[in-house]
Amino acid sequence: MTELTISSADISGAIEQYVATFSADPTREEIGIVSDAGDGIAHVEGLPSVMTQELLEFPGGVLGVALNLDERSVGTVVLGDFQDIEEGQQVKRTGEVLSVPVGDAFLGRVINPLGQPIDGRGDIEAETRRALELQAPSVVQRQSVSEPLQTGIKAIDSQTPIGRGQRQLIIGDRKTGKTAVCIDTILNQKQAWETGDPAQQVRCIYVAVGQKGSTVAAVRRTLDEAGALEYTTIVAAPASDAAGFKWLAPYTGSALGQHWMYQGKHVLIVFDDLTKQAEAYRAISLLLRRPPGREAYPGDVFYLHSRLLERCAKLSDELGAGSLTGLPIIETKANDISAYIPTNVISITDGQCFLQTDLFNQGVRPAVNVGVSVSRVGGAAQIKAMKEVAGSLRLELSQYRELEAFAAFASDLDATSKAQLERGARLVELLKQPQNSPYPVEEQVVAIYLGTGGHLDSVPVEDVMRFEQEFLDHVRGSHADILADIRETKKFSEDTETKLTNAVNAFKKSFAATDGSSVEVKGVAAEALDESAVGQETVQVRKPAPKK
């Protein structure tokens, strides 16, 4: 049996070598302890150096955002599954503020508010990351709105036009077509996208907050079937998600849009809807024991929306002249636009389209109430052709609404009032439009000219939509030069008007109303004078009879 020999020289040499190479570089890591957790909120004790909006890591890789920084604890919103978070668990700092990945690879995808794909189509290779809380462009970094963003909806493009960089509020009760208006606007950008010209292309972002999962799936399917998903990103925080996700989703969409805007590109973002975001933020604030204000909303709920919507802008030429156009949606109750959140967002935005339940139930769709709807800056972006043909449209519709209410009580109306009622009824019918069928702007100009130019006065009200569709088909086939001229020059010249009038008159000869009658307007010939009477006309001036 061999004996074990221990060499003291070898041992001392090994120790000396270890000491020589030893590096006393201790790592310092702040560890917090969960003091209580529940309903998507966790209070963490410790972490004295934590920053506001910093990401914290819970066991299992679940992330949270530090919102409340108290003396002894940190109020954290948990992003993800909070069921497994328990009292006594350790929490680590990440040293990073909340950010999301951005880039062109997100087009055509459905993501959650953390930028992670949820459509089952694999990972997304991001170009870079962008912090959610970034300052909006300053005054000198902006320019005034001057380029139109066509929605494809006649009632909006003619009376409340939207420009690139504008914030136009879509407001109304539930089930009045608010989402449909925004989806039609996204679909209408397809023609510009297919040109391949970056100056015309508009990238779209649809942010779904608190919607049903089936509703988000239906929107995605609609966009996919229309070929619009290739230039659209959907940020989804459905009703089943935690309040933290619903609060963050609009900021995620905005960060993605700002990334493209600062590259000189044009972006359209839809927030559907900000009422549910405010409710989620209210829930978070109450759980964090922040003092409630009006309608139990926290004091900074105005700032919640203002700092989000102020990011929509038309950048100056020095910064690339990109734009971010916002369409926030607000849901009202019983058409009450004087409630807290509606008045807040109305004061922040550049105009609003008010959708009314009564109009919707009457079959006027889109149910835009012209009297309350307004666009404060979009008029500067409206093309001249539309301004010319639609200039009198708002006034005529307003007069029609007043007369309509008066006519319900008056049995006898003068000829002028009757003519206004007849014209107004045809204009209302003309502005009706099926869902998911946006109109190119040149066809909108032609259609609205039919109404404001008096060419529909001889067409029965029930035949107006059919007349419009068949006439547009006729113009596309036989008078494509008229549409091309309006599209290219963006003007409605006298020559174009003459051509269009002749085309309408010729088309009326072949169009038959539902009852089989003709809609052609035939002039009434005056009775001819005898030869002896020609040149014998006299003017007689008579004094009034003296008063007795």
From Swiss-Prot:
SUPFAM superfamilies: C-terminal domain of alpha and beta subunits of F1 ATP synthase (SSF47917), N-terminal domain of alpha and beta subunits of F1 ATP synthase (SSF50615), P-loop containing nucleoside triphosphate hydrolases (SSF52540). One of its GO terms (molecular function) is ADP binding. Pfam families: ATP-synt_ab, ATP-synt_ab_C, ATP-synt_ab_N. It is a peripheral membrane protein. It is an enzyme of class 7 (translocase). ATP binds at G172, D173, R174, K175, T176, G177, K178, T179. It comes from the Bacteria. Its EC number is 7.1.2.2. Its main location: membrane. Keywords: ATP synthesis, ATP-binding, Cell membrane, CF(1), Hydrogen ion transport, Ion transport, Membrane, Nucleotide-binding, Translocase, Transport. Belongs to the ATPase alpha/beta chains family. F-type ATPases have 2 components, CF(1) - the catalytic core - and CF(0) - the membrane proton channel. CF(1) has five subunits: alpha(3), beta(3), gamma(1), delta(1), epsilon(1). CF(0) has three main subunits: a(1), b(2) and c(9-12). The alpha and beta chains form an alternating ring which encloses part of the gamma chain. CF(1) is attached to CF(0) by a central stalk formed by the gamma and epsilon chains, while a peripheral stalk is formed by the delta and b chains. HAMAP family: ATP_synth_alpha_bact. Produces ATP from ADP in the presence of a proton gradient across the membrane. The alpha chain is a regulatory subunit. This is ATP synthase subunit alpha. It comes from Mycobacteroides abscessus (strain ATCC 19977 / DSM 44196 / CCUG 20993 / CIP 104536 / JCM 13569 / NCTC 13031 / TMC 1543 / L948). The lineage of its organism: Bacteria, Bacillati, Actinomycetota, Actinomycetes, Mycobacteriales.
